[in-house]
Amino acid sequence: MSERKVLNKYYPPDFDPSKIPKLKLPKDRQYVVRLMAPFNMRCKTCGEYIYKGKKFNARKETVQNEAYLGLPIFRFYIKCTRCLAEITFKTDPENTDYTMEHGATRNFQAEKLLEEEEKRVQKEREDEELNNPMKVLENRTKDSKLEMEVLENLQELKDLNQRQAHVDFEAMLRQHRMSQEQWQQQQEEEDERETAALLEEARHRRLLEDSESEDEAPPSRPRAAARPNPTAILNEVPQTKRKAEALCSKAQLAGLVVPKKVKTEANGASEQVGVPTAAGAPKSRKADNPTPQTPGTSSLSQLGAYGDSEDSDS
């Protein structure tokens, strides 16, 4: 069996490497690569904006008869994402950038313009200093002044940082928090005072209105008679029961009273009972009664006799 991984290869005795034909490819052969847009651009066909960093499947080729210090220049072909129009741009090794060729316009980039301006100023300065020694001295003086200003600003920043380093931010926050709490407490006290003042004013106004209404009020009407309680009839004692109780009490009182025995006198004055009536006064039914009454009876006996007379009349 042969080996799974062949390490040695067989070369026949008549092997000649020069006889192996070489693959000849065109010099402008294109390769498909994956790249991102190197700058912001706008399509000339449809006006679609293509932002920097958008990915494309591009075709890459080498530009013929163009090079910078032996470095080849490459051209890329992409298609617009909206109208599929072809857009081409190529590398610029001299400025380490890309240049737009066809199909789109490059959008404004302030950073690139700033870099170009700095390069232009630097180049002009070098050209002036090349043949003018006084210009070199003047530029050095300006540079030294500028350096001194920068150092002074840097020292001020350092001093400021040192001053801020000794500041206790926690204490500042606590103080601010305390002041805020005091302000809130003061606001609450003011609200309470205003509320108390409003309540006092309302009470005073109500008292004034009550006094004025009492002065102008009409005389009070008599109160209506109280309505009887509907359940009071349940607690009433029947009239017959009240009469029976009254009779029992009268009989008991009559039994308790004992009339005093008085000797009968011969004259007719002893037969008169009661107090003589005034002249012209009507005689009562008791005066017509011929039954004699004992003059020595007590008030309880008279009360019992008065009750008996009422029962007889009824």
Swiss-Prot record:
Keyword Phosphoprotein included in the entry's annotation: yes
Xref: InterPro entries: Saf4/Yju2, Yju2
Keywords: Metal-binding, mRNA processing, mRNA splicing, Nucleus, Phosphoprotein, Spliceosome, Zinc
Residue positions, PTM Phosphoserine: 211, 213, 220, 309, 312, 314
Biased composition range(s): Basic and acidic residues: 200-209
One Gene Ontology term from the biological process aspect of the record: generation of catalytic spliceosome for first transesterification step
Polar residues bias spans: 290-302
Record field: compositional bias (Low complexity): 222-232
A cellular component annotation (GO) from this entry: U2-type catalytic step 1 spliceosome
Region (Disordered): 178-238, 253-314
Subcellular location: Nucleus
Complexes and interactors: Component of the spliceosome. Present in the activated B complex, the catalytically activated B* complex which catalyzes the branching, the catalytic step 1 C complex catalyzing the exon ligation, and the postcatalytic P complex containing the ligated exons (mRNA) and the excised lariat intron.
Similarity remark: Belongs to the CWC16 family. YJU2 subfamily.
Function text: Part of the spliceosome which catalyzes two sequential transesterification reactions, first the excision of the non-coding intron from pre-mRNA and then the ligation of the coding exons to form the mature mRNA. Plays a role in stabilizing the structure of the spliceosome catalytic core and docking of the branch helix into the active site, producing 5'-exon and lariat intron-3'-intermediates. May protect cells from TP53-dependent apoptosis upon dsDNA break damage through association with PRP19-CD5L complex.
Protein name per its UniProtKB record: Splicing factor YJU2
Organism: Mus musculus
